[in-house]
Structures are given as C-alpha cells and as structure tokens.
Amino acid sequence: MEQKVDIKENYIYELDDKLLEILLKDHSSNKNIIWATDNYSFRGKGYYPHDHIALKSITGRNGLVIKPRVKKSKKEQNKRIKDKAEVFTPSWICNIQNNSLNESWFERKNVFNKEIDETWEVNKDKITYPEGKTWQDYVKLKILEISCGEAPYLVSRYDTVSGEWLELNNRIGALDRKIRVVNENVDNEKDWHDWVIEAYKATFGYEWQGDSLLIARENLLFTFIDYYVDRFENYPIKEYLEEIAKILSWNIWQMDGLKYVIPDSCKPEPKMQLSFFEDDNAPQECPGCKKNNNSQHTGIYCKVMNWKTNRSIKFYRGEKKMKFDFVIGNPPYQDSTLGDNDGYAPPVYHKFMDE
C-alpha cells in the first residue's frame, strides 16, 4: 500500500523518462510549475517558493522529497494549514458531495452508491440514465475541483486524510465514476481508450501549491493505469501514458483561484514620473490587487486548453471565465478578498458554473 499511496517520482521516471517532464509543465508560463510554498526552502537553491520545480530536484537522491499529505509530519501538516489554509477532506465527505452532484444530473438518489454513516455501499447494477440523457453525455460533463490539493473529489485512489487505499470498485471520485460508465458501455480497447480520453478532457482542477499539484496530476495518471490494467490485464503503452499526461498538464493547473494568475506572480509597476523631483524608482502596487479588479493584474494569467478547438485560451477573459457543468471542492472555500471578512466571506463556486 505504501507504493500505491505515495507515488515515487523515481518510479515514474523509470516508467517513462518523458512523463515527469510533461507532468511538471506549466503552460501559462511555458516553464515548469513553481513550488509556491516555503516548506522546502530549507533545502536551499531550487526549492524556494518562486523556484520552478526541476526534474533533478525530485528524482535521484531527491526522489523522496515530495510526499502526499498523509505521509507528511504533523508539524508540516499544521504549518500548511496555518500558511495556506490547506484542508483535506475524508473520502466519505467527498462521496456525499459527489453524490449530490449526481443526484442533480440523474434526478434520483443513490446512483453509484448508498451512503451509510461514514462509508458507503456500492450500487453494483449497471447505471441507467434519465430520458433524454446518455452515458456519453455523462462522460462529457465538465467538472472542476477548486483548490484541489491532491484531487480527492476527482479521483479516490486513497483517502487523503487516513491514507486508506480504496479498491477500484469502491472509488467515489468524479473521474472514477466516468470511467465506470465507460467500462459498462464499451466492449473493445479502442472505444474504451477514446471515451476515457473524453472523460479526462472534461475533468479539471487547479491548485496553488506545486507539490500538491504534481501529486494531483500523478493521481489522475495512475488512476488511468489502475483502470487500464484492471480492464485489459496489461500495462498501457507509453503513448497512452504520455497522452494522458499532456491532458493533465493543461487540465490540472497552478493558479491563484481568486486572481486567476500564477500564484504570487503579480509584480509592482514602475511609477510614472510626473515631475523632475519625484522618485522615479518608487514602484506602484499591482493595480488588480490594489483595486480588487481581476482584469488588471500584472501577474501571469493562467491558460487552459479548449479541447474542441485544440487551442489554448486564458482562463479569465475580462468578465468572462471558463464555465463548467459542476464545480466541487472543500466546503470552507470562500472569497476572502472582499472587504472585512473576519465574520463572513461569500462563496465562489457560482463564479465557475455554466449559466
């Protein structure tokens, strides 16, 4: 179970030396993702919050640097809670929330499982669909996990709080459910591959911290491996793995979810000198941060892929943001940028929902 929960970067590198390079890619900056946490700063150069995560920093003798939350020390867990309000949700709560989304779409309860206290009983019958809806429609639903951490709402290889390993037939993630639907409705490898690719292209998540983001991408990649091996009793070819990794490098991206830019990428602007006597070196605060205007940030705005056109687009375009059929995430997630929020902060889920 140790290897299953904590995916070793050295193992991925040995599997295919291109995979980690793809999984580390940040398409918004056209560089690698950044650490965006000071938890690794004690290691020195290459591990500071604004440093890009290099392959050599997490492989070879550094192959054990990145660990899932459940494998981190309590001290480190508490520090991340304090610094970035990092919250991980047990699988049974993720299941309740995912069930709620499915109840809305299927127009009935207990579609994939029945909740029983802090666990669930799997519905083993083939899933049926409401009139006018098909299994293909379900697979294509665009689902976003906000502030996704290790992506427990999307895939549930293990409980991110307890570390308990979940067998395939007991998984509750949104992508797990889509792959189950594909399994129930196709009978050959080509169709299975094509529809699972559609499922991945419709599954999204963003995260601030680089280590958690990489783990999320790894979890989604190995979810593909888990289901492929179970279905075809063989390991997927490298081309399949690289295809999935490339999708994940776009769909699971690094972002400040309140500003829609790469974390901490906003920089002060040079002040315009109005007179000879003014200090022309005094910088001005990022206008977007100062005015709480998301169209005026000096940071690097994040890009996502429009898979219908195979062209990248900015996630935030003026007052328009990419929309999704369902948005899921930790219940406390709120917008803390509006006024005095000591007692109340408005939720942000609706900002991403399809209208």
State each model region's role.
Residues 2-355:
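SAM-dependent methyltransferase catalytic region
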